[in-house]
Swiss-Prot record:
A Pfam family this chain is assigned to: Zip
Motif XEXPHE-motif in this chain: 374-379
Record keyword Cytoplasm present: no
Segments carrying motif HHHGHXHX-motif: 249-256
Lineage per the UniProt record: Eukaryota, Metazoa, Chordata, Craniata, Vertebrata
Protein's name according to its UniProt entry: Metal cation symporter ZIP14
Amino acid sequence: MELLRPALPSYFLLTLLSIWTAASEARAVSTGMPTISAASFLQNLMHRYGEGDSLTLQQLKALLNHLDVGVGRGNISQPVQGPRNLSTCFSSGELFAAHNLSHQSQIGEREFQEFCPTILQQLDSRACSSENQENEENEQTEEGRPSSVEVWGYGLLCVTVISLCSLLGASVVPFMKKTFYKRLLLYFIALAIGTLYSNALFQLIPEAFGFNPMEDYYVSKSAVVFGGFYLFFFTEKILKMLLKQKNEHHHGHSHYTSETLPSQKDQEEGVTEKLQNGDLDHMIPQHCSGELDGKTPVVDEKVIVGSLSVQDLQASQSACHWLKGVRYSDIGTLAWMITLSDGLHNFIDGLAIGASFTVSVFQGISTSVAILCEEFPHELGDFVILLNAGMSLQQALFFNFLSACCCYVGLGFGILAGSHFSANWIFALAGGMFLYISLADMFPEMNEVSQEDERKGSALIPFVIQNLGLLTGFGIMLVLTMYSGHIQIG
């Protein structure tokens, strides 16, 4: 009996506690206070984020965003090779794909209960915290970059192809007076404008800001930017053609006013444009064939380019002096200016190519395509200028190719800078350069070529060729950007 006495007070306390608990529950029922059940938590979430007893995929995504779950940068269009670590932060698309959910899916209570462990695991692993997100993005960037062999191999290949374009100038010299040459050159200039401008809008400038076309959805806005440029170009050309026809109808073709005649200053400033566009009618001596017939022509002409004056070299020996060797001291200053500026231009091109290949092989090839489309007409124009500045055919080929080889030096610097530093600054520099070259350099050149063709015939054909070139370049860059996540190279 003595052993049972200490237990009596404890038993008495438990009895009182049970009675108090039962009384509290009875009082709660009598006063109308709701009792908490497990289903009430689920119903509360369904009513807060959904409509009725179901959730759409967008509503479920809103819940995930509120919890900072599913904010990873994974891409379901590029499946990960091998098993994925569950401690990483998945994107909402990857989580939905794991549960076989599509945009048309309706998530009921049962489906939501099956999805809840996924949310709980991501919260427990803290994989989507800001610190882990930064580390994971850095690791994925390093893993996604091409190897050194791929960077140097593809880079050297693309630069070699681009540099070989400098040797194509000699092949078109016999056709420079043909009509189809002018129109072919017009198409390539328009193609270069379209590719350079679109490459800057779709890839280089967004890449400089760290945007991803598969995730940031900027492609449509960049396309609208090009659309604004093209709309004003198209409208201006149409208005000019209509006004030209109206003026011709009222004034005819037999009289010219003093306003329509170009001044001497305008003629001198336009010579450089004519050289770049392949207009050699006023530069190539018409008696060149006399040299080949054994005659010795006498030439006393000057080539005026801006403020520079270049004598026709070796006039007592040959009017077609580029077919023979010329002393370097007799070559005009313009030739060396063109060679040096072209070398600097090619160096920056190589810099952009090298930095692009350090990010991805696809990015590098895309940038190389834009530069290739620009280099072809550009090198042809430079080749013509070198010939008419006093160089022989062999010298023009050599120095044009030498300046093109500066692209290799730029490639090396671009690869080294992109591998050890952020390539975004190089992309920003290249994007600005591409915009300037396309709009301030090549666009007036395209207008000059088209005006020469318009004076000889209808303005409709040059206008159609310009549109084809611009839209082709735009289409190439648009397709490459939109399908960049589906194209695997290397």
